[in-house]
From Swiss-Prot:
Residues 52-62 are annotated as: Interaction with ITGB1. The chain crosses the membrane at residues 118-138, 154-174, 204-224. The gene is TMEM182. Residues 27-117, 175-203 are extracellular. Expressed in skeletal muscle and adipose tissue. Negatively regulates myogenesis and skeletal muscle regeneration via its association with ITGB1. Modulates ITGB1 activation by decreasing ITGB1-LAMB1 interaction and inhibiting ITGB1-mediated intracellular signaling during myogenesis. This is Transmembrane protein 182. The lineage of its organism: Eukaryota, Metazoa, Chordata, Craniata, Vertebrata. Its main location: membrane. GO terms for cellular component: plasma membrane.
């Protein structure tokens, strides 16, 4: 009875972990940024403060325009139904936010691409590992194999560790690697009242929750494998 309960909750936590990892991996809301500034001198733009909204993930970086007095800068502005009907997108790997013009030959750009490369590799390894863990657990269930349960549990723990590194690296990226101060100063040459507001998006927030469920599932499956091994003697 206790073994069945452990398998049930292990499977439940594993399913939640896989779902959260895949959603975080596949959606483009790890970073949300709002640029505000009155730069245009056109008469029709007089008295209005324009805003550009950016959201970025593993695959894409997208942006769309809006009006500050019509929309606030909260996270809800980036929800699907609140976005502009048309927006521009580019690959996030070679053009991460903030994208400074004429920087492709600079050392900072090269460092950013290399850092994003490591982050990308860890993200892919985490997704592959958790899919392999799920496959091992599915194979273990019909045969009650303690080896497969232990292997699956180990892979879930490894996936949790990899995604923990992904989260930590992204925090370091936003806080240190992304040259927001230089980007803001460059923009202020054209727009003296320019300001940029950056926050973590809901895709980023799902990743630590997925890490928790993956680690919990991994430990449960290790205990299940040990219990099956002891009962088989």
């Amino acid at each position: 009875m206790k073994l069945s309960v452990g398998i049930f909750f292990g499977g439940l936590f594993a399913a939640l972990g896989v779902l959260l990892f895949l959603v975080a991996f596949g959606t483009d809301y790890w970073l949300l940024a709002t640029e505000i500034g009155r730069c245009s001198k056109a008469p029709e733009d007089a008295g209005t403060e324009k805003a550009t909204f950016h959201h970025e993930g593993f695959f894409w970086r997208c942006w769309f325009s809006g009006n500050v007095r019509e929309h606030n800068t909260s996270m809800w502005k980036f929800w699907y139904t609140n976005q502009s009907p048309s927006k521009n997108c580019t690959h996030a790997y070679l053009s991460p936010f903030p994208h400074i013009r004429d920087e492709h030959n600079s050392t900072s750009y090269d460092s950013a691409v290399i850092y994003r490369g490591f982050w990308t590799v860890l993200m892919l390894l985490g997704v592959i590992t958790i899919v392999m863990a799920s496959f091992l657990i599915i194979c273990a269930a019909p045969f009650a194999s303690h080896i497969l349960y232990k292997a699956g549990g180990g892979f879930y723990i490894l996936a949790g560790v990899l995604f923990s590194l992904v989260v930590v690296m992204y925090v370091i990226w936003v806080q240190a690697m992304a040259d927001l101060e230089n980007y803001t100063n460059m923009k202020k040459m054209d727009c003296p009242d320019f300001a940029v507001y950056v926050r973590y998006g809901w895709s980023f927030m799902l990743a630590p929750i997925g890490v928790f469920f993956a680690l919990l599932a991994g430990m449960l499956f290790l205990l299940v494998g040990r219990a099956i091994y002891l009962n088989s003697d």
